[in-house]
Each structure stands twice: as C-alpha cells, then as structure tokens.
Amino acid sequence: MENNLENLTIGVFAKAAGVNVETIRFYQRKGLLLEPDKPYGSIRRYGEADVTRVRFVKSAQRLGFSLDEIAELLRLEDGTHCEEASSLAEHKLKDVREKMADLARMEAVLSELVCACHARRGNVSCPLIASLQGGASLAGSAMP
C-alpha cells in the first residue's frame, strides 16, 4: 500500500493515514484538509499529499499542538517560514514546561497526602479526604 498512495477512496486513504473516515471528514470541516473535487457520477479520490498532510496533523497533535496551532503550522509548511514555526514551537515548549511544573507540584502534594494517609492512626479522619474537603491547605497548593 505504501508504494501506491494515489487515487485512493476515502476509506483506503484513512487507513493509509492511520485514522478513521470520520477524522478525515472532521479535518476537512476544520480546514486542515481540502476536500477533493467529486467528478460527476464518481467518488472523491485522495493522494499521497493528502496522506502526508494527515500524518503531519497527527504528529503535531502528539506534540501537544491544538488544531488551531496546527492550522497555523500548515500555513507555514512550505518551509520558508522557519522563524515563525520556531516561535510557535517555543510557545508550545513554554506551555509544556509550565504543565510539567504543575504536574510536579501535584505529584509532591499527592505524595505527601498518601504518606499522611499511611501514617494516620486510630479514628483520625483521612488526611486526603480532609484536604479535598478544604480541611487542609495541601490540596490547594497543588494547583497554580
């Protein structure tokens, strides 16, 4: 299949791109993928460039780019706008680092709460539940 990616029906195209047909239609509605002309009395056909474009979208999504950001990257895809693409990637990297810092804070708080749960004795209420109910400030410190 890899060696002949021209003149594909939407089902074969979706399979070649590693997505389902509804994803193809969704990308078309969002303007991420052009809908090919439909010859009179026939069906639309897709080619290798379409497969490449969908793979681009999926790769960008795996890196955390939103569909709007991907649309902007696609606008720059001729390769001559490296500075603009780099700027978008730097912004995404900043977002990822902020999320990682938030996750590290959440991990620290949850770890502390789990330890507190294991250390509790007797009829003392659960520190995790108490924290989530506002009885302690630990849970609040996990979120920015």
Swiss-Prot record:
The HTH merR-type domain extends over 7-76
Gene3D superfamilies reported for this sequence: 1.10.1660.10
Xref: InterPro entries: DNA-bd_dom_put_sf, MerR, MerR-type_HTH_dom, MerR_fam, Tscrpt_reg_MerR_DNA-bd
Segments of the chain annotated as binding DNA? 10-29
Gene Ontology biological-process annotations? response to mercury ion
Q: What is the effect of changing residue 82 to A?
A: Abolishes transcriptional activation
Keyword list (alphabetical) reads:
Activator, DNA-binding, Mercuric resistance, Mercury, Metal-binding, Plasmid, Repressor, Transcription, Transcription regulation, Transposable element
Provide the binding site for Hg(2+): 82, 117, 126
Q: What is the effect of changing residue 126 to S?
A: Abolishes transcriptional activation; loss of Hg binding
Q: Which GO terms describe its molecular function?
A: DNA binding; DNA-binding transcription factor activity; mercury ion binding
Q: Report whether Metal-binding shows up as a keyword of the record.
A: yes
Report the outcome of residue 117 to A.
Decrease in transcriptional activation
Entry superkingdom: Bacteria
Known function: Mediates the mercuric-dependent induction of mercury resistance operon. In the absence of mercury MerR represses transcription by binding tightly to the mer operator region; when mercury is present the dimeric complex binds a single ion and becomes a potent transcriptional activator, while remaining bound to the mer site.
Mind telling me which NCBIfam families this protein's record contains? MerR, PRK13752.1
What name does UniProt use for this protein? Mercuric resistance operon regulatory protein
**Natural source organism:** Pseudomonas aeruginosa
